[in-house]
From Swiss-Prot:
Keyword Translocase among UniProt keywords: no
Source domain of life: Bacteria
Biological processes per GO annotation: isopentenyl diphosphate biosynthetic process, methylerythritol 4-phosphate pathway; terpenoid biosynthetic process
UniProt-recorded name of the protein: 4-diphosphocytidyl-2-C-methyl-D-erythritol kinase
Organism, as annotated: Buchnera aphidicola subsp. Schizaphis graminum (strain Sg)
Subunit field text: Homodimer.
Keywords: ATP-binding, Isoprene biosynthesis, Kinase, Nucleotide-binding, Transferase
Entries under HAMAP family matching the protein: IspE
Database matches in InterPro entries: GHMP_kinase_C_dom, GHMP_kinase_C_sf, GHMP_kinase_N_dom, IspE, Ribosomal_Su5_D2-typ_SF, Ribsml_uS5_D2-typ_fold_subgr
Pathway(s) per entry: Isoprenoid biosynthesis; isopentenyl diphosphate biosynthesis via DXP pathway; isopentenyl diphosphate from 1-deoxy-D-xylulose 5-phosphate: step 3/6
Length: 292
């Protein structure tokens, strides 16, 4: 059986920074929704005990990234929590990368989440999604939302999740060919880091906003120009800390019309938001229970 799995992108429909911990982690309130677009991972388990990652060109990746880290963490947890011998837990992982790096679409976090969920099944370690989500915080704060796989209000540093249902819409995702480091953007002093935490029902009724957008627009003139252009036709803002911008539409035809107006030096992709992650859908289609 071919084990090819979705590693979907997300957008932050709103993102507020509500505080900062003594260790540098930021408290947030954000609304995550998944897209029917993203990377794919082909994961082939073996008993050699090694984790190997290959790119689209079948080149072996020699640097440690979120995928390798996730696989190694799962092996370690299985050893310490279950007393399982994990020396034979291995896999070849082939990454088909479509989500741009530094785009705010969550590619690295999504890759780690797909790795954890799929290897948990293939290695039969049988951890719950909640246990995987807690483990994933050792890698990154966005990963629990990808593991749980629902449209979600995210609070705390990413560990507090409130699943909600939201109307699925069409989006034009615009990548300005700029890669933005989340770590670097969080370090900028002028970003508002004390937005008052608000009740969820109030947030959902209010106009959505991203606390990073003003700083990003000042720092990157091209992003500011694209937001201004797209906002003439549809609600538009950055996702995450950028660089991608999304414009929201009620139908695909409207998104296609605005896509045709984009400058030639930017990439545009038309996608649809989904309330259930494509990764979870893939498990349902294979009749595999994620909630053991």
């Amino acid at each position: 059986m071919i084990n090819t799995w979705p590693s979907p992108a997300k957008i932050n429909l709103f993102l507020y920074v509500t505080g900062i911990r003594s260790d540098g982690y930021h408290y947030i309130q954000s609304l995550f929704q998944f897209l029917n677009y993203g990377d794919t991972l082909t994961i082939i388990p073996n008993t050699k005990g090694t984790i190997e990652l290959f790119t689209e060109s079948n080149s072996l990746v020699n640097i440690k990234n979120s995928i390798i880290t996730a696989a190694e963490l799962l092996k370690e947890k299985a050893l310490h929590s279950l007393g399982k011998k994990t020396s034979h837990f291995g896999a070849k992982i082939f990454l088909n990368k479509k989500i741009p790096i530094g785009s705010g679409l969550g590619g690295g976090s999504s890759n780690a989440a797909t790795t954890l969920v799929v290897l948990n099944n293939l290695w039969k370690t049988k951890f719950t999604l909640q246990e995987l989500a807690e483990l994933s915080l050792k890698i990154g704060s966005d990963i629990p939302a990808f593991i749980m796989g629902k449209t979600t209000i995210v609070e705390g540093i990413g560990e507090i999740l409130y699943p909600i249902h939201r109307k699925e819409k069409w989006y034009l995702i615009v990548y300005p060919n700029i890669s933005i480091s989340t770590k670097n953007i969080f370090s900028i002093y002028s970003i508002k880091k004390n937005t008052i935490k608000k009740p969820i029902d109030f947030l959902l009724r209010s106009r959505f906003h991203n606390d990073f957008e003003n700083v990003i627009k000042k720092k990157f003139k091209k992003i500011k120009q694209l937001i201004s252009m797209l906002s003439l036709y549809a609600p538009s803002r950055i996702t995450g800390t950028g660089s991608c911008i999304f414009a929201e539409f009620n139908d695909k035809k409207s998104a296609q019309k605005i896509h045709s107006l984009l400058p030639h030096n930017v990439q545009g992709t038309i996608v649809k938001s989904v309330n259930v992650s494509p990764l979870h859908h893939a498990f349902y289609k294979k009749n595999i229970n994620l909630f053991n």
